[in-house]
Curated annotation (Swiss-Prot):
GO molecular function annotations of the record: GTP binding; GTPase activity; guanosine tetraphosphate binding; ribosome binding; translation elongation factor activity
NCBIfam families: lepA, small_GTP
Alphabetical keyword list: Cell membrane, GTP-binding, Hydrolase, Membrane, Nucleotide-binding, Protein biosynthesis
Any one cellular-component term (Gene Ontology): plasma membrane
Pfam (any one): EFG_C
Stated family: Belongs to the TRAFAC class translation factor GTPase superfamily. Classic translation factor GTPase family. LepA subfamily.
UniProt catalytic activity: GTP + H2O = GDP + phosphate + H(+)
Enzyme class: hydrolase
EC number of the protein: 3.6.5.n1
Protein name: Elongation factor 4
Organism this protein belongs to: Wolbachia sp. subsp. Brugia malayi (strain TRS)
């Protein structure tokens, strides 16, 4: 065990984590030159296209150090986006040390702070790595000062590297050997392993990633899941190099994967402790903090027979990503679908895109919403995230909405516009300070979550030309003036368009959606009325005029009463059509109507 090192790479988005992982794999000959690709650990197409890491990945490397000894390094590459911070927490719990990667041209950013504090909470030894030193804008001395002043870590021994060119990579590997501690554990003790992650493999079935704390995990061993006492027999044991390599056992301090012919996805709960059936350990390891979704939306298949396939796809994805939730629901307008909960808007987009790509589904998603706490006149407290579950306004006593504490780092020249954006989103400023001797402002704001989840991050990046960074965490619930905005098309309610908005925005939002629907719904033979209502009161209306068929075209001259008779007959026909005709709203109309901020 003295020759094992478990470490994670943590950083803000785009500071070069995955590129550094590529260079470490290359240096340790993890893959042959012809097998190397950029972002080799980002296995999903969507990760490579967006240039982001979504799933934390693990890889075992063998490295011969300058002291002549051969070391086994278990590397975890983690995501940097705030939506995927739970992936970072899980990876850190399986390691003893962290490489803190900072872009030497950008400096310390909001997620750098959030992730380094997580590492400190896990008692990690931290090695500071300043990346991109080959860039003309690189300023390592300024960034070293920032690290000491903001984070409070001594940066005199920071390693200067360029993950792109490979400069300084060997120094990083030597620092991992000399500065990071070896894992603690007893090989002779009863088996005690923590379940770090799980996913579905089409060939192997359910695959579980484990970190063995004590004892030895062997092929053929009968294991017990301590959360529910489910018993399974281990079929395969392996490690990632980053290719799958089968092995016969994993001993204390090692990270690897196992398969055990699991049938129930509920049996592989992330954070659970695995032990041996014959010789169980005395107690379970402390698990991970439960994470709860904060953004909800409904997803419906566009094909009538798509519900069954959507359920199967969600179940398989849920195995790979336990952080989102889903439950079946039905809509008058869109049929059968699922109400899903996510950790943020990027998480929602990624899951929807994976469903469409990996499972070839055609989907419609409704407007995102957060969880509101509603206290009724009778004193009952309800948690509402679906607008159609909101009680009538006369039955509501108080509505409370979630607020967050946001940490925003922004260059001084964009500060005014960012402050205006936060105020426009009903924010309350808590603190404004400057980072060390730099021209970077550190803002602390309290903001309603509903104002942040939609397009706040995009607006923040767009105003600051990409330089601002954001990190946030749920703070508390506060009383708020909330309306349920409903829509009627020809007097019929369209439940899929309903949304929950702040009172100050309801009329403006109603007008926007009505205007969009007017342009999106095809014209009919009769007039179509589109109305937005709040508590039974109409706040906005648009009308789609009918096609006009010229029924008098065949007449020439003659008595005017003949013309009047034909027009009267047309009017009666349209009236009859209006009373029985259902307006067919195209699926893309729902998507376009609910788009925000464009």
């Amino acid at each position: 065990m003295d020759n094992v090192r478990n470490f994670a790479i943590i950083a803000h988005i785009d500071h070069g984590k995955s590129t550094l992982a590529d260079r470490l794999i290359e240096e340790c000959n993890g893959l042959e030159a012809r097998e190397m690709t950029n972002q080799v650990l980002d296995s999903m197409d969507i990760e490579r296209e967006r240039g982001i890491t979504i799933k934390a990945q693990t890889v075992r490397l063998n490295y011969t150090a300058n002291d002549g000894n051969r070391y086994c390094l278990n590397l975890m590459d983690t995501p940097g986006h705030v939506d995927f911070s739970y992936e970072v927490s899980r990876s850190l719990a399986a390691c003893e040390g962290s490489l803190l990667v900072i872009d030497s041209s950008q400096g310390v950013e909001a997620q750098t702070l959030a992730n380094v504090y997580k590492a400190i909470d896990n008692n990690h030894e931290i090695i500071v790595v300043l990346n991109k030193v080959d860039l003309p804008a690189s300023d390592p001395e300024r960034v070293k000062l920032q690290v000491e002043e903001i984070i409070g870590i001594g940066s005199s021994e920071s390693i200067l590297i360029s993950a792109k060119t490979g400069l300084g990579i060997r120094d990083v590997l030597e620092a991992i050997i000399t500065k990071l501690p070896a894992p603690q554990g007893n090989i002779n003790a009863p088996l005690q392993a923590i379940l770090v992650d799980s996913w579905y493999d089409p060939y192997l079935g359910v695959v579980i990633l484990v970190r063995v704390k004590n004892g030895v995990l062997k092929k053929g061993m009968k294991i017990v899941m301590m959360s529910n006492n489910a018993v399974y027999q281990v079929d395969n044991i392996g490690i990632f190099t980053p290719k799958k390599v089968m092995t016969s056992e994993l001993s204390a301090g090692e990270v690897g994967f196992i398969t055990a012919s699991m049938r129930k996805m509920a049996d592989c709960k992330v954070g659970d402790t695995i032990t041996e059936e014959k010789k169980p350990c005395g107690e379970a390891l402390p698990g991970f903090k439960e994470i709860h979704p904060v953004v909800f939306c409904s997803i419906f298949p566009n094909k009538t027979d798509g519900f069954k396939y959507l359920r199967e796809a969600l179940e398989k994805l849920h195995l790979n990503d336990t952080s989102f939730t889903f439950e079946a629901e039905t809509s008058n307008a869109l049929g059968y679908g699922f109400r899903c909960g996510f950790l943020g808007m990027l998480h929602l987009e990624v899951i929807q895109e994976r469903l469409e790509r990996e499972f070839d589904l055609d989907l419609t998603a409704t407007a995102p919403s957060v969880i509101y706490e509603v206290t009724t006149q009778s004193g009952e407290t309800l948690n509402i995230h679906n607008p159609n579950d909101m009680p009538d306004s006369v039955k509501i006593k108080i509505v409370e909405e979630p607020w967050i504490t946001a940490t925003i780092m922004v260059p001084d020249q964009y500060l005014g516009e960012i402050l205006s954006l936060c105020d426009e989103r009903r924010g309350k400023q808590e603190d404004l300070s400057y980072v060390g001797n730099t021209m970077t402002a550190l803002l602390k704001y309290k903001l309603p979550l509903s104002e942040v989840v939609l397009d706040f991050y995009d607006r923040l990046k767009s105003i600051s030309k990409g330089y601002a960074s954001l990190d946030w965490e749920i703070s508390n619930y506060q009383e708020s003036q909330i309306d349920k905005l409903s829509f009627l098309v020809n007097g019929e309610p369209v439940d899929a368009l309903a949304c929950i908005v702040h009172k100050s925005r309801s009329e403006k939002r109603g007008r926007e959606i009505c205007a969009r629907l007017r342009d999106l719904i095809p014209r009919q033979q009769y007039k179509i009325a589109i109305q937005a209502t709040v508590g039974g009161k109409i706040v906005a209306r648009e009308t789609i005029n009918p096609y006009r068929k010229d029924v008098t075209a065949k007449l020439y001259g003659g008595d005017v009463t003949r013309k009047m008779k034909l027009l009267e007959k047309q009017k009666k026909g349209k009236k009859r059509l209006y009373s029985v005709g259902n307006v067919d709203i195209p699926h893309n109309a729902f998507i376009q109507a609910l788009k925000i901020g464009d």
